[in-house]
Amino acid sequence: MTDAAARETELKFLVDPGAAGALFDALPPGTDKAARTLVSTYFDTDDQALRRAGFSLRLREGVQTVKSLAPLEGVFGRGEWEAPAAGDAPDPDFVAGTPAGAFLGEAAPSPRFRIQVSRRVRLVERGGASIEAALDQGAVEAGAHGGGLCELELELRSGPTAALFDLARDLARIAPMTLAFASKADRGFALLDGLAPAPRAPAPAPVLTEAMSAGAAFQ
């Protein structure tokens, strides 16, 4: 049974594909992982019981993951439960052992949409913190609907949260970035509903000063 959630603290930004490479190259020196293609399949019941309860269920590269769609604490922390998976469908016992299991009843989740991205990852140290930066570029496919995706994600692996905001503030000087509150799962469900938003350009780069705190920079 999966009882405890790993809490993710992360910032996600929508970025212009044309500026994505420059943003990644502007990251502090660190350890780069080999670029790879990730294919994720998201599951739910016909009546979207998991989505309505605030969860997503994903299968990717032999790992099954339940995530809370709404933050557990504050704005940037989400709950996550994961375990190895065998085959092309999540294990019912795994799902039952997470908070999402209480909302399924006898219904069996089935594939709803698919997300494929090319991912570049760099592990960096900043202000006493270890941060994983991931650049995802790809597409969401939901039935007859689809849409492009270009995100830069900064995840705090350890250390003070302020360092995460400081790094994001520095990157915002390189190119415009729009803070993304919607998860990849949210985008997939929106496409499934035929409610995909029109492409949105990132907000203009904010005016930042050295004296400005990280919190003030994101207001």
Question: Which residues make up each language-model segment?
Answer:
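Phosphate-end processing signature that detects enzymes handling 5′-triphosphorylated RNA
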Residues: 1-219
